[in-house]
Swiss-Prot record:
Residues 1-57, 475-497, 694-716 are annotated as: Disordered. It catalyses: a 1,2-diacyl-sn-glycero-3-phospho-(1D-myo-inositol 4-phosphate)(out) + a 1,2-diacyl-sn-glycero-3-phospho-L-serine(in) = a 1,2-diacyl-sn-glycero-3-phospho-(1D-myo-inositol 4-phosphate)(in) + a 1,2-diacyl-sn-glycero-3-phospho-L-serine(out). One of its GO terms (molecular function) is lipid binding. Belongs to the OSBP family. SMART domains: PH. It comes from Mus musculus. It comes from the Eukaryota. The modification Phosphothreonine is found at residue 27. This is Oxysterol-binding protein-related protein 11.
Amino acid sequence: MQGGEPASVMKVSESEGKLEGLATAVTPNKNSGNSSCGGAISSSSSNSSRGGSAKGWQYSDHMESVNGYLMKYTNLVTGWQYRFFVLNNEAGLLEYFVNEQSRNQKPRGTLQLAGAVISPSDEDSHTFTVNAASGEQYKLRATDAKERQHWVSRLQICTQHHTEAIGKNNPPLKSRSFSLASSGNSPISQRRPSQNAMSFFNVGHSKLQSVNKRAHLHPDHLVEVREMMSHAEGQQRDLIRRIECLPASGLLSSLDQDLLMLKATSMATMNCLNDCFHILQLQHASHQKGALPSGTTIEWLEPKIPLSNHYKNGAEQPFATEPNKPMGAPEAQCVAESGVLAREPEDISADDEVEDTCDNKEDDLGAVEEQRSVILHLLSQLKLGMDLTRVVLPTFILEKRSLLEMYADFMSHPDLFIGITNGATPEDRMIRFVEYYLTSFHEGRKGAIAKKPYNPIIGETFHCSWRMPKSEVASGVSSSSSTPAITDHAPLPEEAPTQSVSDCYTVRFVAEQVSHHPPVSGFYAECAERKMCVNAHVWTKSKFLGMSIGVTMVGEGVLCLLEHGEEYTFSLPCAYARSILTVPWVELGGKVSVNCAKTGYSASITFHTKPFYGGKLHRVTAEVKYNLTNTVVCRVQGEWNSVLEFTYSNGETKFVDLAKLAVTKKRVRPLEKQDPFESRRLWKNVTDSLRESEIDKATEHKRSLEERQRTEERLRTETGTPWKTKYFIKEGDGWVYHKPLWKGIPSQPAE
């Protein structure tokens, strides 16, 4: 251990690192160099003084100097050593010293961040590497996941800033003097496509020739370039549509290797052109004479698709060559428009949504005698502990909903969700959150039905909302009240009188499948009227356990109560499918935690799995503690799909009967208004086939979607084209909604 480094550095536990490290990891450095040691980060920006309010999910994009202790891997002999690191944003350098006292001396090592790559490790939540353009590499380890996330975020912002400066400060090379209108002697001119192909992929040559005549780039020409980019991108979208709408088999099919390569190459070309256009803008801005007037803002002229090229509400429109083709025909279900469409977020108004009338009631599997041969064939290919992420499971075990919609169903009690922020004290708010958390699983898991939802396709999204009458949301009365307000709940929404929009709170929900391998989903919900939102990302890891299958929900969520300046970090339990050869059933298991670093309250929740002999099914216990005094303020016991008993520190008890708890129906857009990649429209053919008990037909539709996803993933890998998400942005190890409520509404702690 180096001098000047307090011993407390080595005492950070795993749980504290994950849940509590954030509040103390970042401190303002307004006065002097009083930096925290032992992995604590000192920041020169006053904005970081918010502490733990949103650091796990929000980072400002301004330049911020950071310094603090990190462990650096030296070599096999020496191993890991503590070193004091300084991020010099102005110079674009990452420097390190033996300890903080020697920071006034020459640094022991320096890395240029321009062109560098910052890579968090997949093996653990503490390690990351900084790979400089020169080939030099620093392998570093933070005290905990939150500290690593902060360092990675600051380094990435600094790297991006100085990398973009390269394009601005170094003008592009002079263009070569050759003419596109050459004689017919070049190899390209000799490879003329057939007339039929030209009519299929029509290109506006007259406009392209007009661009070739412009020898000099004047300021006004940036607008013209943008217009041409818009035109080219519109043609590329049309190309993708035409390829995807070809029949799946025949002389020219949508899965033809040459056409798939053409689609991927055109996508990569447009991405490259967008980057070049951005460099032109930077170059033009650097040549502007004189300083800009104060208050002037610069808006980049991003290429935009003309309105005529947009398809309203994402609905498919027939081509001019096929005017009588019905929208619902399988050939016209152009599902894989993912390349361009998935990159453009869409603001969906809750006014476009209607109360859900879809009845996807699930029947339990019961005995699986008829499917035993299918299951035995599958089991013969599996090994104990094998990862099932890439294993295709039989269709008959599927629910009629996507995993993304399952996450939405966890929000089916919006009155309890909104009521959290009504808690009068931090203790009351924590208890209300635990109550909401425990009551969410019975609807999210549809009781304990032994079926699994669809695995979402990458780029798949799901949108919905709930309207909750303000009169039905619990007031600020303490949750420890013995009045059975929840067991004698208000009537179900369909029985309640019609409420105007102004008399209701609106809870909006959006989910997106942001990664395929590993399968990661991001979801976000907010109630803007009450200034509260929840952001979460979940990686589902499934393993074969012999006669059962276990699914681990890796990831975490954060509930932000902006009215109180509080954040509640939580995790999710594991799920197990038992007795898969006889009568399958599902249970939840494992320990999860809820923590609020600001108030010092935490909750430990245990989902008990059934022992081999005796014991109850679906049992859950929980304790809510005040960490500063280690006092238990509430205990919970019961079954997560039946009855829960809350016992408070004053001796009072409350029972929550989940069978009597009202479920608010979600509001969704009609199917014809949904985008091609929204869950219900994407899986429509599979769902319809399952409703009709056409298992073979459902399997074929499901296989078609999965094969298309694999093909596109392979082509993206071959062409080096990264996947771009639509609504969520990767920050450190997590995924954050692109327009979270906390970015628009400042956190204002209550007096």
